[in-house]
Design a protein with these regions (language model features):
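Short, flexible beta-strand-to-coil junctions
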Residues: 111-113, 129, 145-148, 175
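Solvent-exposed beta-hairpin/edge-strand motifs
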Residues: 137-150
Length: 175
């Protein structure tokens, strides 16, 4: 991608994948996404040779952080039914969008959605190049996704009624 650094590309990729893996429904991940597969800017590679379509396994070493993030998000999704409710009425009952600034999507999965052990889960996706904040219910929250890291056991605690998410990244917290 022209005019973008590798660091920004990685941040945006992780942000996009967080949107995919925290959305309801069946997630779809293309082959090689977890290692930043590159098709050399060929937009329709159907008839391109293997040199364009192959998986470059060296990228797995080069982008370990990306692979680990994907694996962590997949594990988080599998462990928490709130991210994969099976019926539309469940989604309507347990998912609510949170007011957010331009370039930010925020939602809450509430009331132990899908039978989840976590009572409330806030997902905040920030596409802006500056930190952004959203107002939430006053409380003490455990961070499980922040700054390109995933840890279901927790990355720290946040108390209060404001969640601030780093530029071009995602924040997931629960109580």
């Amino acid at each position: 991608v022209p005019y973008i650094t590798d660091d920004e590309l990685i941040r945006l990729d992780l942000l996009a994948q967080t949107a995919v893996l925290t959305s309801q429904g069946v997630p779809f991940i293309l082959s090689g996404e977890e290692m930043l597969r590159d098709k050399k800017s060929v937009h329709n590679s159907f008839r391109s040779p293997d040199s364009i379509n192959r998986l470059d396994w060296n990228n797995l070493k080069r982008y370990t952080q990306v692979f680990d993030y994907y694996a962590g998000l997949i594990a988080l999704r599998k462990a928490h039914p709130a991210f994969r409710m099976g019926k539309a009425e469940e989604v309507r009952k347990h998912l609510e969008f949170v007011d957010a600034p331009k370039g930010v999507v925020a939602f809450r999965l509430k009331d132990n959605a899908g039978g989840d052990a976590w009572r409330n889960i806030y997902v905040v996706l920030n596409s802006q190049k500056t930190p952004q904040s959203v107002k939430v219910a006053e409380g003490s929250y455990t961070k499980v996704v922040a700054n390109g890291k995933v840890n279901a056991e927790g990355l720290g605690l946040i108390s209060g009624s404001t969640l601030t998410v780093a530029p071009q990244s995602a924040l997931i917290v629960h109580d």
